[in-house]
Amino acid sequence: MEVLMMEERIYTIPLRDVINKSVRTKRAPRAIKKIKQFLKRHMKAEIVKIDNELNEKIWERGIQKPPARVRVKAVKEGNVVIATLAE
């Protein structure tokens, strides 16, 4: 029987470069991709799932104005990372 280790970390992910380098109408989707890419690199996982709360926070002000940075709590179980909004 395998025992799965749960690893939990809190990150502040900067999204300003996505905002500055993207066309206005693609900022929020690119912010989501940036979060997934960041967590894949830092948590060394293949699959990253984003919680509904975090998704709503990114899309809160629409497609053109995602937040400049976001605090994320990442929980890794096996090869899957689940990202939620940190309090």
Curated annotation (Swiss-Prot):
Coiled coil: none
UniProt keyword terms in alphabetical order: Ribonucleoprotein, Ribosomal protein
GO biological process terms held by the UniProt record: cytoplasmic translation
Entry annotated with the keyword Transcription regulation: no
GO cellular component, one term: cytosolic large ribosomal subunit
Family annotation (SMART domains): Ribosomal_L31e (SM01380)
GO molecular function, one term: structural constituent of ribosome
SUPFAM superfamilies noted in UniProt: Ribosomal protein L31e
NCBIfam families tied to this protein: PRK01192.1-1
Family membership: Belongs to the eukaryotic ribosomal protein eL31 family.
Protein name: Large ribosomal subunit protein eL31
Gene name of the encoded protein: rpl31e
